[in-house]
């Protein structure tokens, strides 16, 4: 939805691959935002009904030439017209005031990017795994509030200024993992990241599917390597 007013336009960039079971929840949560001046841009490499669902919900869909979240984000970003850009993963669900809070926080010119705190999507977590998942979620929120430790944060939803994004370019499409750490590390040269006092719901499906300890260590290791050594981890397993 886009309206003509003085409030800055937010270009919402969503990479998708076979997200037909989840993307509708994100798109509906976007429609329920208190802040209404936005456009939805999807970079898609799906084999399922994801692009059709997105189009029905009013999103503009662009076919990525290669698989990967970086390619999806980049093709959508090239079509973005907004003063602000919101990079959101397809399995995130927003609470109603995320964009409103982000626009206000970005009035501070020393803030380069903002992100909500996260809550797990409880319905997809087996009861016996809830304690460890909630512990990891609390750790992720701590890292967001602490402005990242070693460059590691939770990047499922980040809103920033387009002019700052233009300074750092695009996501590295050669990276299969930690491409977000690499991108936001470059962006952090121009200001601080700030935690918003609002929440979004985050999917821990990959932790559950692939094993919680293994997935946690996998993400941590590669995020820290990317942040510390500033180099691509091109040999990593592709997980998305």
Regions found by a protein language model. Name each.
Residues 29, 42-51, 92:
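A conserved acidic beta->alpha catalytic loop
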Residues 120-127, 141-160:
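A recurrent flexible, glycine/aromatic-enriched loop bordering the glycosyltransferase active site
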Residues 85:
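Short aromatic/hydrophobic "clamp" motif used to bind/position activated sugar donors
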Residues 64-80:
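Glycine-rich, basic loop-to-helix element that forms the pyrophosphate-binding segment
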């Amino acid at each position: 939805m886009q309206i003509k007013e003085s409030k800055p336009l937010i270009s919402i960039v969503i990479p998708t691959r076979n997200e037909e079971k989840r993307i509708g929840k994100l798109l509906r949560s976007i429609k329920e935002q208190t802040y209404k001046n936005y456009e939805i841009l999807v970079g898609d490499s799906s084999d399922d009904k994801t692009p059709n669902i997105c189009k029905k919900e009013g999103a503009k869909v662009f076919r990525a030439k290669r698989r990967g979240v970086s390619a999806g984000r980049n093709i959508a970003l090239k079509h973005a017209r907004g003063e602000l850009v919101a990079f959101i993963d397809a399995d995130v669900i927003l609470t109603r005031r995320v964009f409103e809070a982000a626009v206000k926080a970005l009035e501070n010119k020393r803030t380069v990017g903002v992100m909500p705190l996260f809550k797990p999507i409880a319905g997809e977590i087996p009861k016996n795994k809830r304690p460890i998942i909630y512990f990891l979620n609390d750790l992720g929120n701590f890292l967001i509030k602490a402005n990242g430790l070693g460059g590691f944060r939770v990047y499922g939803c980040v809103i920033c200024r387009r002019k700052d994004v233009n300074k750092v370019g695009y996501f590295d499409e050669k990276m299969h993992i930690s491409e977000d750490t690499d991108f936001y590390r470059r962006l952090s040269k121009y200001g601080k990241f700030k935690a918003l006092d609002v929440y979004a719901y985050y999917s821990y499906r990959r932790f559950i599917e692939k094993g919680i300890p293994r997935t946690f260590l996998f993400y941590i290791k590669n995020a820290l390597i990317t942040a510390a050594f500033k180099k691509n981890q091109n040999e990593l397993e592709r997980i998305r």
